[in-house]
Amino acid sequence: MKSIDLHVHSTYSDGTLTPSELVKKAFSINLAAMALTDHDTIDGIPEAVSCAADYDIELIPGIELSTFYDKKEMHIVGLYIDYTDKNFKKELESLKQSREKRNEKIAARFCEMGIPVSYDEMKKMYEGAVITRANFADYLVRKGYVKSRNEVFDRYLGDSKPCYVPREKMLPEKAIKMIKSVGGVPVLAHPVLYHMGNEQMNKLMDYLCEHGIAGLEAVYSTYTMGDELEMKHIAKERNLLISGGSDYHGANKPDIELGTGRGHLFVPEEILTKIKEYKNNI
């Protein structure tokens, strides 16, 4: 059975490969399907779809929406979205403008600390991309202001650090509604990464199920076998779909490979069959 990867980022957010390069790489490693799930943007999907038409691989239009729940940043992945929907594009444009304002504030804070970050220069450097904290980290390393991306987050951009600026908060329920409004399948991204105890996780899943979540990422690059079994148990208990992916970012996450994560990731094609069945019955 072939494998798939349902969580991948391109240069249109904080990945380092273009959509076309991702499709070609996915084909070269024999993936049956790949979902392009850039942060809060669908701008890379047309290029990916066009490229995939020349290769024997299914390209799934997707997105990863950033939300907040109980003071935690939380991501909702949308699979099989209608990326041509005009209202959806308008909502994403609003999110983009909010992120722009935040990025300008982050750049200003660096300048106040004596680190000359030019946001105009960054926009040229990452032209067409949704600029995230990962881009700030890459920029600072390139300019020689810090030695590593980890240093940026440890000293400046991690939550509560001096240059961190909180984003405008969107609730997961809104992200789920947005995804379902364009025929997509909403999935909770990497739940283990939110470091919740059983009580917190149950409360979260109650809330998400109430608002129409369809599945969760039970297979993920950094999960242990125990993590994967636990997530699959939660999915089965709540009659949710299982999704999975590498969360590949290219050089921005050098220890994560497309399709295989840290070497042990395998997302079976049968997972996609069940997601398609759900999609067809919406």
Model-inferred region functions:
Residues 51-206, 262-282:
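Extended substrate/RNA-proximal surfaces in nucleic-acid metabolism proteins
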Residues 1-72, 156-158, 170-226, 230-253:
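An N-terminally biased module of ancient metal coordination in phosphate/nucleic-acid-related enzymes
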Residues 253-265:
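H/E-rich (His + Asp/Glu) clusters that bind or coordinate divalent metals
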